[in-house]
UniProtKB/Swiss-Prot annotation:
Residues 1-18 have a biased composition (Polar residues). One of its GO terms (molecular function) is mRNA binding. This is NEDD4-binding protein 1. The lineage of its organism: Eukaryota, Metazoa, Chordata, Craniata, Vertebrata. Transmembrane segments: none annotated. The gene is n4bp1.
Length: 848
């Protein structure tokens, strides 16, 4: 900023060494902008910013006669030395920037610069003292001096790199960073809270370091203006009320965090802010009348003053016990021993999770199933989303039973209102109840060796503490205490554990083999197969590519839909897609989104088209049944050029006989020129080497013993010999009562073996051995007689469906699949297959 004059001085009194006053000039036409920016500057930097006036105010001799605006105005900054310097650089970016840059970023990162109530953007400005604004989603504008702008741009580019690479922290650091980041974001909760929690862990760590490192080293100065004091008090009140306002997301996570551990002690930069409990309760979600009739069961110590007392006993090391008894049958799940230190057992955490989601109105069976599948260490938000999905599915499948169960869970039954032991007359009976609670939990932690006598005695003691009116209404049910102590291991957990083993895709830079066919990999099929049909595992694609590369293939193409590049928690290790695309191996099939609906081309068609052009092999476990009638060439590809696979963990495996036990071996199947396995043929064609099983048929006649190459005549369109059938032909035909001209399928592959009651081996007087038999079967024509003898009619393509038929099929499919998320898929299938009328086939495509 070009200054007309710069004046620096220090304050007087005790703050003389700490407070600095800097006066400088700015362009006169920026006066209104600076006055509007005054609150923003003072909020970003601990300084007192004042617009003093124009230079003409202090130099009356320089007043202009034409009444024009003054060229320069005086500005004053008062505060710590470092804070004043940074604020001055920031004002320089507002008034007279030396450098202006625009930086684009992925739209998914907009939550960083607009979320957390603008906290991260403010920290970025304080750290780099550049004027950083967000003119539009996906674009950042940076103005100021050269050094501040370069620093800000470098910091933003680092964020973008971590986001695009989806970098994760080491396993021992990631949980602590996630907890600290979640605590910080919830203190600045807004509509971007969920998006911020889904960021990569390395980016979360970088944002936390930005927020924690941005601490001005200068001491705070005392502001002399009473207006500034009032403004700071108002801002503080607004901030307190804002932090006290709980949202459904913060309600869920804060209650769990308050029981599990106190994360705030680990992060000095994240300070707790006091708030009123009544303010927080005033903004909770509205509950129904049925919910108000029953008392809630919170499992957080912060709500104890409202829902129940915390009783401490000096004999048990001041371990707090929450008395939450709503039903005698739920006694074991309601009374939870919360230890004061951090070593909370997994069994206690499991009970806390189950009971917490039960109080939200969800069925216990659904809650236990979801926690068992995902694990109790999963993020609460993901658990809540999955529980909501499972509840909707059960509601659709069993509407009558589930609705009754949900109504009971939400408190709409006719049971009497349960009372919490708060009143003084009940305290005498509550004391032995607490003793029994501790004994109950102590035996529960001991394991499954508890005797039934102890359980019954404990339940009898507990029953005596319950009021008489509740005893007659509710009958407790006997349940094992350790029913859910050990959640079952799931395939999802095994897959997630396998991802912890590091894998790198390294392809050797060496020439391959030229006689190998083009390999076309169905990326979606391979990725979902490796991800156990639950995750889109990009590692599976990399393993398949590495397998074929090591076998010498260099013509490899992988097809993956374009929308798989979007961030999704169910798509793992997306960096493999980027690596394969850079190598020219991966190709994305087109897809786009219009008004929230995805429009994607069928990637299977790209596989078949490329296989038709290159003569390649398609690696997939799909059978492509919907494309069999499209063209004869595609039908041949589907029959003869599909290569199936399997995964054994991270090991990609292929069968030795891709087309069956009588088909070619894997090396022959992948080679352009199959290896000649006969003794008399030097370079046979592929048709001579192998005929698919559907084409197997015996030769209609064999040549006589005195000649192998007799001329053939045509009769009824089939090849017939001129000589009569010889004894060799009689031996070749089975004698089981079937057609004489029908031979077993392995007649072209194996010599005849002696069987009781069937054909006998070839007589020695014929002078034919095994090699002569193969030479005898080999024709002199380009194709074997078996292929000529089979009538292969061209498939008849049915007429295209009429609009009315399409509407009928769509209505029928919607009745079968009433879920709303299936409608778009049904429309895609009907538009992609305009000739198909089979409702069963269409239903199978929807299920795929």
């Amino acid at each position: 900023m070009a200054t007309g004059s710069v004046h620096s001085s220090s304050g007087n009194g005790r703050s003389q060494a700490a407070t600095v006053v800097d006066e400088f000039t700015a362009p006169g036409d920026k006066k209104s902008l600076l006055e509007r920016s005054r609150p923003r500057v003072q909020a970003l930097f601990p300084v007192l910013f004042t617009v003093l006036g124009s230079l003409e105010t202090f130099h009356q001799s320089e007043v202009k006669e034409d009444g024009e605006k003054p060229c320069r105005i005086w500005l004053q900054l008062k505060g710590g030395k470092q804070a004043v310097g940074r604020a001055k650089e920031y004002l320089k970016g507002i008034c007279e920037p030396e450098m202006e840059e625009k930086q684009s970023y992925p739209k998914e990162m907009h939550c960083i610069f607009a979320g957390a109530q603008g906290s991260f953007l403010n920290h970025l400005i304080r750290d780099t003292y550049a004027n950083v604004t967000v003119p539009d989603i996906g674009v950042l504008s940076m103005k100021g001096g050269t050094e501040p702008v370069v620093m800000a741009q470098s910091r933003v580019q680092q964020f973008i790199r971590l986001f695009n690479d989806n970098v994760s922290l080491p396993n021992h650091k990631e949980p602590a960073v996630k907890k600290k980041f979640k605590l910080y974001v919830e203190k600045h909760a807004d509509k971007y809270t969920v998006d911020l929690l889904l960021l990569p862990s390395a980016l979360k760590s970088e944002l936390l370091s930005l927020a924690c490192d941005d601490q001005l080293s200068g001491e705070d100065f005392s502001r002399q203006s009473s207006d500034d004091k009032v403004e700071s008090q108002v801002n503080q009140k607004d901030e307190v009320s804002r932090n006290g306002a709980g949202t459904p997301v913060t309600e869920l996570t804060s209650q769990l965090d308050s029981v599990f551990s106190s994360v705030a002690e680990d992060s000095p930069c994240l300070m707790e802010r006091p708030y009123s409990e009544q303010d927080r309760l005033s903004v909770k979600r509205r509950s129904s009348e049925a919910e108000e009739r029953f008392s809630k069961k919170p499992f957080s110590l912060e709500a104890v003053q409202v829902d129940g007392p915390v009783n401490r006993n000096a004999d048990t090391n001041n371990v707090p016990i929450i008395d939450l008894i709503s039903e005698p049958s739920d006694f074991e799940d309601s009374v939870i021993l919360v230890e004061a230190d951090d070593n909370v057992s997994s069994e206690t955490e499991y009970k806390i999770l189950v009971n917490f989601f039960k109080t939200m109105g969800y069925s216990q069976n659904v809650v236990e199933k979801v926690i068992g599948d995902l694990g109790q260490s999963e993020e609460p938000l993901k658990l809540l989303e999955e529980i909501e999905k499972q509840s909707k599915k059960e509601l659709y499948s069993h509407p009558s039973s589930n609705s009754t169960e949900l109504l009971k869970a939400r408190g709409t039954s006719n049971l009497p209102k349960c009372k919490i032991a708060i009143a003084e007359p009940v305290q005498q009976s509550a004391a032995p109840l607490k003793t029994q609670c501790k004994a109950l939990l102590a035996t529960d932690k001991a394991g499954p060796s508890n005797s039934s006598h102890d359980k019954s005695q404990t339940k009898a003691t507990v029953a005596n503490t319950i009021p008489q009116d509740q005893k007659t209404t509710i009958a407790p049910t006997e349940r094992p205490l350790n029913k859910h102590s050990d959640p079952p291991l799931t395939g999802v957990q095994i897959f997630q554990n396998s991802l912890k083993v590091e894998y790198r895709l390294e392809l050797k830079n060496e020439p391959g083999k030229l006689d190998l066919k083009h390999i076309i990999i169905d990326g979606s099929n391979v990725a979902m197969s490796h991800g156990l049909k639950h995750f889109f595992s990009c590692r599976g694609i990399a393993l398949a590519v590495e397998y074929f590369w090591n076998k010498g293939h260099r013509n490899i193409t992988v097809f993956v839909p374009q929308w798989r590049t979007k961030r999704d928690p169910y798509i793992t290790e997306q960096h493999f897609l980027q690596q394969l695309q850079e190598l020219g191996i991966l190709s994305f099939t087109p897809s786009r989104t219009v008004l929230g609906a995805r429009i994607a081309s069928h990637d299977d068609r790209f596989l078949l088209h490329l296989a038709e052009r290159t003569g390649g092999i398609i690696v997939t476990n799909d059978n492509f049944r919907e494309f069999v009638v499209e063209s004869p060439m595609w039908r041949e590809i589907i029959k003869e050029r599909l290569l199936q696979y399997t995964f054994a963990g991270d090991i990609f495996m292929l069968p030795d006989d891709p087309l069956g036990r009588y088909g070619p071996k894997l090396d022959d199947f992948l080679s352009k020129q199959p290896i000649n396995r006969t003794m008399h043929s030097s370079s046979p064609s592929s048709n001579e080497m192998f005929i698919p099983r559907d084409h197997f048929a015996p030769p209609r006649a064999m040549a006589p013993r005195n000649g192998l190459n007799q001329p053939m005549t045509q009769r009824n369109g089939l090849s017939q010999p001129m000589a009569p059938r010889t004894e060799l032909n009689q031996h070749m035909a089975p004698r089981t009562g079937l057609n004489q001209h029908m031979a077993p399928r392995n007649a072209l592959r194996q010599p005849m073996a002696p069987k009781t009651g069937l054909s006998q081996p070839i007589a020695p007087r014929t002078g034919l051995d095994e090699s002569s038999l193969f030479q005898l079967i080999k024709p002199q024509e380009p194709f074997p007689p078996a292929v000529h003898n089979i009538a292969r009619p061209r498939p008849i393509i049915p007429p295209q469906r009429s609009p009315s038929e399409t509407m009928e099929l769509r209505e029928a499919l919607l009745k079968i699949f009433p879920e709303t998320d299936q409608r778009h898929k049904i429309n895609e299938i009907l538009s992609a297959h305009p000739y198909m009328r089979d409702l069963n086939a269409l239903s199978a495509m929807v299920l795929d």
